[in-house]
């Protein structure tokens, strides 16, 4: 639901009062009447949360789960219709943490706390939207649900998440550089994502703007990595003047592109660029074999290279066999 209904539409309001779970129903007749309201959910079955006193009847498009929490706190549910609620981003993070890997849960956290969303269908790509939540709000939600299923994994994944990612590849790069060595990461100090730099008068004159936003940043060291994605960097001259302005301010900015992130050799080169100036949270050496494995898992979790053919056709279609126009 969170991927199918962009927040820009304003269709899902947050429920501002607690929900007594005893008020929920698993009546199949009632569920059938609500199915039109679930049309935005592209995948089936739809998962329904009810109290332990509700029957777990069978419906081919619905899977019913029972919760032993008597009350769901205010602010964790969204209103789809008068009689239908869906889990908000914080509760979704908790629930999915119990169903997926630690890497998968953390990548979901980056997405929920970032300004992008994957599509509801299992294809690569993403769309822009405002952040659905933040680390502060997820932390508050987890504190309200002690003992909930998946809470341990959710807290582990939460520690890895950063606010502010604008794309899956920013998430991949941040994860590879900041995740601990036990997960295969480089264990660099966590960067700030899309950090705001206020320019002085001279730098403003060069850049033509009074502030800049840097993709991955370590402010104390004035070091930054910029992901050179085609969607953001279409004005080469403006980018050059922006980087000249940042250099005037004492910043060192390294630019990387998709090829630098999607395979281990160029990523290792990026690591060498910053390893002498960015603090690490581990004394263990960076293991490039483990980093390669983590990179593969991060790319898979962000659907890298997962084409649209599986969503568009009912049979496997060899890449390049058909010209598709979207």
Residue spans for each PLM region:
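Short gly/ser-rich loop at a beta-strand->alpha-helix junction or flexible surface loop bordering the NTP-binding
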Residues: 1-150, 181, 286, 293-326
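Surface segments flanking catalytic/ligand-binding clefts of nucleic-acid enzymes
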Residues: 128-326
């Amino acid at each position: 639901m969170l991927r199918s209904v962009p927040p820009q539409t304003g269709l899902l309001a947050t429920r501002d009062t607690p929900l007594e779970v005893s008020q929920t129903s698993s009546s199949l007749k009632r569920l059938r009447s609500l199915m039109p309201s679930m049309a935005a959910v592209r995948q089936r079955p739809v998962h329904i949360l009810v109290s332990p006193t509700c029957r777990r009847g069978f419906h081919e498009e619905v899977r019913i789960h029972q919760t032993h929490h008597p009350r769901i706190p205010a602010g964790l549910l969204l209103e789809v219709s008068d009689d239908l609620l869906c889990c908000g981003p914080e509760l979704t993070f908790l629930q999915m943490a119990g169903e997926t890997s630690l890497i998968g849960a953390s990548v979901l956290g980056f997405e929920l706390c970032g300004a992008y969303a994957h599509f509801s269908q299992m294809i690569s790509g993403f769309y822009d939207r405002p952040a659905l939540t933040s680390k502060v709000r997820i932390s508050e939600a987890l504190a309200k649900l002690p003992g909930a299923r998946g809470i341990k994994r959710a807290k582990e994944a939460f520690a890895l998440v950063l606010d502010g990612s604008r794309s899956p590849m920013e998430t991949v790069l941040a994860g590879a550089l900041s995740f601990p060595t036990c997960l295969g990461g480089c264990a660099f100090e966590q960067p700030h994502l899309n950090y705001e730099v206020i320019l002085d008068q001279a730098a403003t004159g060069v850049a033509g703007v009074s502030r800049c936003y840097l993709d991955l940043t370590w402010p104390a060291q004035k070091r930054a990595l910029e992901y050179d994605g085609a969607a953001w960097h279409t004005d080469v001259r403006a980018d050059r003047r922006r980087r000249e302005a940042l250099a005037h301010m004492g910043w060192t900015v390294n630019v990387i592109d998709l090829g630098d992130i999607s395979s281990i050799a160029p990523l290792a080169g990026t690591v060498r660029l910053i390893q002498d100036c960015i603090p690490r949270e581990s004394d263990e050496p960076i293991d490039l074999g483990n980093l390669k494995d983590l990179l593969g898992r991060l790319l898979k979790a962000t659907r890298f290279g997962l084409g649209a053919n599986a969503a568009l056709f009912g049979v496997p279609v060899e890449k390049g066999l058909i010209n598709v126009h979207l």
